[in-house]
Amino acid sequence: MEFKSGFLNTLQVRGYLHQCTDDVALDELMALQPITAYIGFDCTARSLHIGSLMQIMVMRYLQKFGHKIVVLLGGGTTKIGDPSGKDKARAMLSEAEIAANKAGILATINKFLNQGDGVVIADNAEWLGEVRYLEFLREIGSKFSVNAMLGLDSVRSRLDRDQNLSFLEFSYVLLQSYDFVELHRRHKCVLQIGGADQWGNIVNGIDLGRKLGLPQLYGLTTHLLLTSTGEKMGKTADGAVWLDAEMFDPGNYWQYFRNVADVEVGRLLRLFTELPMNEIAELENLQGEAINEAKKVLATEATAICHGKSAALAAENAALQVFEHNDDAGLPHFPLHKSLIAQGISVAKLLQLAGLEESISAGRRLIKGRGCKINGMVVEDADHALTHADFARNSGYITVFCGKKRRIKVVVED
């Protein structure tokens, strides 16, 4: 389908769009006039990570095409915990932890958006904290069918595996649905956007609005951020790829995108840069060693959007100093049998096997002191399990640096 509205057309062409309720009607509306859309973020950590970057980029495009945005921070729903995609309940956070996380997430989002340009920051604690239980059950709870709620993926997956699902988590969909209704009442919000795992919650919010007599509401989801093999992206030997510079520094952020698999380059250029599509097509079609130039462009452009142009250029220059003046081809090779990474091998164990450290405990001490890098990225988790995926995305090998002088190329062999 070819959309009339610039926003929806961009989402489709660049590969964000997963599902949309009544896309024809929403397209007509967005082509006719600016609308107000919202995206919600629960305050479960001090920063967002690249799993949320899809939604952040979508917000940038909402601004670009003149639409208004409500950024909803889940000061209230964080106390409950969204069960979507989770095998067990989240740990309960204190009020102070939620407040600190809220401040950190807001600071992260502020880096990506032009503040004051049609952006409203809301916190659902404002209205959920005022809810009277019996009135909520009468007005909102009566509009939900337990039969239908049991069919939600977030619920069914836990029950099918005989995993505990508390009533607290089971109630989450009611609260998210109520958020949509409340945001329409307060800000005339007509569109909710979220990841693909939020589809059930979004549709329930639309249905609640209909039952309460609100005008037509819409929902839209983006694809989850997965690799070409279906694994979640955003995990490294350094942990999650956070968008906060203190939690994941710009140099590591640059290296993360520089080290993606060749097959991912075009897709990530479309998603996480704002380069014109014709330029992306040229970069995507590079072959052999030339694809590394496209990876550098991806890394620099993505880092500039997240951390600023100067930080991106500094990260690029630092990487060039390491890699282009210390060619991988000249590094000593260490063969690693593929059976050792079938179940994953810890970084500390690899350092011992490769002779870079005398023992696993020595490797742990080195990593604790931030003295080890894999593919240019500082390793902080000594127990991170390196698997085939880590090697496959870098043509079957990784480079390991310990301090300034001990450098090897670890190659997987049969």
UniProtKB/Swiss-Prot annotation:
Keyword Ion transport: no
Molecular-function annotations in GO: ATP binding; RNA binding; tyrosine-tRNA ligase activity
Pfam families, per database record: tRNA-synt_1b
The species this protein was found in: Anaplasma marginale (strain St. Maries)
Function, in words: Catalyzes the attachment of tyrosine to tRNA(Tyr) in a two-step reaction: tyrosine is first activated by ATP to form Tyr-AMP and then transferred to the acceptor end of tRNA(Tyr).
Annotated motif 'KMSKS' region, positions: 232-236
The protein's name in its UniProt record: Tyrosine--tRNA ligase
Keyword Lyase attached: no
Compartment list: Cytoplasm
EC number: 6.1.1.1
Residues the entry annotates as binding L-tyrosine: Y38, Y172, Q176
Residues bound to ATP: K235
Keyword annotations of the record: Aminoacyl-tRNA synthetase, ATP-binding, Cytoplasm, Ligase, Nucleotide-binding, Protein biosynthesis, RNA-binding
